[in-house]
Amino acid sequence: MLPIRDCVQQTPGYVPGEQPQTTDYIKLNTNENPYAPPDEIFNNLEEELKKVRLYPDPVSTKLRKAAGEVFGFSYEQILAGNGSDDILNIALRTFVNPGETVAFLDLTYSLYETIAKVHGATIQTISTNENFELDSPLICPEAKLIFVASPNPPLGKHLNRQYLKETCEQATGVVLIDEAYVDFSDEDHWDFIKEYDNVIVSRTMSKSYSLAGMRVGFGISSREIIEQMNKVRDSYNLDRIAQTLGANCFQFQDYFQSIWQKVRTTRNRLIASLRNLDFFVFDSDANFVLASPQWIEASDLYTKLKERKVLVRYFKHPRISNYIRITVGTDAEIDRLLEVIKQLKNES
């Protein structure tokens, strides 16, 4: 019998969204950016490809400096990761001994629970109200690490800012604020890093910078925290192509800001259109919306959309079992989605 750790055997594992191997689907299920990065980011790639026999910069210096210029922090306060998921794992290894407590909301990014269980941590979930929002700060005195996403998936709304501030003030451990979707909103938490010595903000280039296939993320915090996290980072955790493309993307802020605004405009149109089609839809600060059809079971709608080559995300979580999550695509993709939904509604 294989000597598999108990915590691994008891963990079902993270279930990612479908990644079809054909191109005939409208893919609105994994919150990727519908717009490609500018062609110019590939200009110096050939030079890097010639160096693939060599290890990349182990600490991603150029990438961190480029990120620091955009984020407004010294590169010494930034840790680069293989996607922001890497940052979450590094934080666990840095701050939480097996058996110690990790806290997060009862409805949030499901990877938090998976990686905490695999780490052997004790899990404390914090309840949200009937609207999946906080009624109070996240108070968990025994938690060595609190994961909190804002905007928070799968709802897509920012958490109450004052409650987050009080969470950071009262926490005895580290608070990691996951800002994977923040560029599609008007709010960030950079000031929390300057105000509190126990805060990490994580960012990803998968959503807003159109680099989901490259896996580039960051942890931003005090120099002291980043120094400790760097000790447990995997060696060479970003390949040279990811480092190069990530750094290049930061040179095109005007372009990316324009597509963030495009996504926000399309998102608002999608919300209004779904409401007109008899959906209950939450407002969103992200590049997706959470919607509940009032005329069909969400699981059935998910299946019928998939049969018509439109992929959305359905979760079996009991609190959102009659919701689907829809990534904001291009206007043409959203038009097709709405067209199919109208057809299905007329047939129901």
Swiss-Prot record:
Pathway: Amino-acid biosynthesis; L-histidine biosynthesis; L-histidine from 5-phospho-alpha-D-ribose 1-diphosphate: step 7/9. Pfam families: Aminotran_1_2. GO terms for molecular function: histidinol-phosphate transaminase activity; pyridoxal phosphate binding. It catalyses: L-histidinol phosphate + 2-oxoglutarate = 3-(imidazol-4-yl)-2-oxopropyl phosphate + L-glutamate. Its EC number is 2.6.1.9. The modification N6-(pyridoxal phosphate)lysine is found at residue 207. It is an enzyme of class 2 (transferase). Belongs to the class-II pyridoxal-phosphate-dependent aminotransferase family. Histidinol-phosphate aminotransferase subfamily. This is Histidinol-phosphate aminotransferase. It comes from Crocosphaera subtropica (strain ATCC 51142 / BH68). The gene is hisC.
